[in-house]
Amino acid sequence: TRNCKAHIKIIKLITPPPHIYSSMSSIAENKFTGGAAFEFELVPGRKVGPNHPCFVIAEAGNNHQGEVPLAKKLIDMAVESGCECVKFQKRTTNAILTKAILDRPYTGRNAFGPTYGEHRDALELSFSQFEEVKKYAESKNIAFTASGWDEASIDFLADGLDVPFFKMASADLSNFPLLEHTAKKGKPMVISTGMADIDLVRKAVTLVK
């Protein structure tokens, strides 16, 4: 890699005992579905819910550092670890950052460019690179998706890559315009709720339903 060398330990996953995912699913049912069965197909041929094993997703994020070979290595490691899906992140930097932040000098030892905008751009994969990475994941029989952090990225993931589901970051739980834009794509959504209170979670769920 360019500025730092990744040291990644592969841990083989073991399917958890049934009571773990059953109890978690029961909580979801009681809180948001009024006790109705919480079960749906997240990727083709794979349902999630009370009577199904945990669906384990490897978080690749932007750890590819803008390099396709490293992205493929992350996929290989996800497969070797026993994950069913690998998830990346997609951002349009000039859509989510102000000009002042984009132009800010960024000269730390791990910087990938002289400004923060150039640094962030260097950590992104292009559309064509994402297409290559998705095809590689498919060749390894592992599901592929990504978190879209802006509407342009969501459009690409839905219309360009046709991801099976969207993963929304907890940072965007209160980003109602982005949640609504994503929900209109008609695909399943997995929405993180870190640091949110239950009222905000309810509002987000109501919006996307």
Positions of predicted regions on the chain:
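Active-site mouth loops of central-metabolism enzymes
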Residues: 56-70, 119-123, 143-147
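Hydrophobic faces of well-ordered beta-strands that scaffold small-molecule active sites
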Residues: 56-58, 86-88, 144-146, 166-168, ...
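N-terminal amphipathic alpha-helix/helix-capping segment at the start of soluble metabolic enzymes
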Residues: 26-57
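Glycine-enriched alpha-helix->loop->beta-strand junction motifs that scaffold or abut catalytic
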Residues: 158-166, 184-189, 209
